[in-house]
Amino acid sequence: EWGYAPSGRAYTIADQSEAFMFQLARGRHYMGARVPDDAIAVMPNHFNLHGLTDYPEQFYPADVVTYAIARGWYTPAKNGDFSDFDFARAYQAEDEFFGPRNVMRQKNGLRIALDRPWSVEKEGMPFCVRANRPVTAQMMADILSSHYEGTRDCCAHFGPGLSPHDASSIRYICTGTTLESDLFILRDEPELTTVMSSFGRPCQLPY
C-alpha cells in the first residue's frame, strides 16, 4: 500500500524446486521473474531484469512502463509499442546502468559459474543464463569469495603486498565491507534445509 522507501533492493524467494527474484525501485515499482529450471542467475548490486516478456513468468505493476514514461526515464521508439522497454535502464540511475563495479561482479560471477570467459560486449548483462553444469556449494563459495583472481579485472586494481579488500577503485564480490556470507542448500523437507555461513569475509573464513 505504502511502497518502498530505499532504492535498489533485491529479494529471492526460493524452495527446493524453484526460485523467484525481485528487483525493487523506490516506491511501488519493481520487476520480478521466476528463474527457469535450467538457468543460473547472478544478481549483483544493480538491476538486470530488462524486457516485459523475457521470461515465461514475470511480475511487475501495471504502470511500470507508464510511470517511467511520465518521469522521463523511458520514451518508446514507436508510440504505444513498449517492446523496447528495459526495466534496468529505465529505473536505474544513469551512472549505475552498466556501471563498472557491478558489471565486474556479474561478469566474474558468470565466468566462475559457467567455467568460461563472459563477454559483456557480446553477451550483455542478462538476468539469468542457461547453466552448463550442476550448481554446487563449492561453486557458490568460489563465486562469493572471488576477487577475480587470474583475470585482468583483478590485477589492474591492487599491487604486490596490498589487499584486494582495500582497493578503492573497484568493489569485488568479496570486498572490504563483506560482514558475512551465506549458502543455502534447499531440501524437499524445509526442516532439512542446510545453511552454511562464513562469519566474515569468505576468502578468509570457512563456511
Which residue ranges define each predicted feature?
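C-terminus-biased signal that marks the final domain/tail of proteins
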Residues: 2-23, 27-207
